[in-house]
Amino acid sequence: MSEKKEFTHLHVHTEYSLLDGSAKIGELVKRAKELGMDSLAITDHGAMFGVIDFYKACKEEGIKPIIGCEVYVAPKSRFDKNSRESVSYYHLVLLAENMEGYQNLIKLVSLGYTEGFYYKPRVDEELLRKYHKGIIATSACLAGPVAKTLINGSYDIAKDMALKYL
């Protein structure tokens, strides 16, 4: 008898991740159910437009919805919109652990649009420190802070970057 292996995708883009995601929420959730998954995350780029549809679809299928977002983090300040560096950013996946985390995630994403928008909705370290409660952060993708630093060959800086989010 083989033991059931549990697996949850924690970094998932839907059709709301423009130019990056193509999965339609309903189909995605149904497929997760077919594969025997009991939970699934949504982490669209810089937006939470699909969260309500995702939540409802997951509940209908008996899957635990994990609400998240892959945010863009400005290297310095979200208000910096004049320097060459201000167009750069790194990715960070944020997952709501509880209701407080969900509310903080909504604040972060909203402020990314209202205060930090420069080509993309950006947050910064100040906002992440202020609204971190109830949120789990992962290093995202190759555009994440740890991966970018490792790719550049800076192990010690990457380690410091990872430890910053503990």
Regions found by a protein language model. Name each.
Residues 1-166:
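Phosphodiester-processing cores and adjacent nucleic acid-binding clamps
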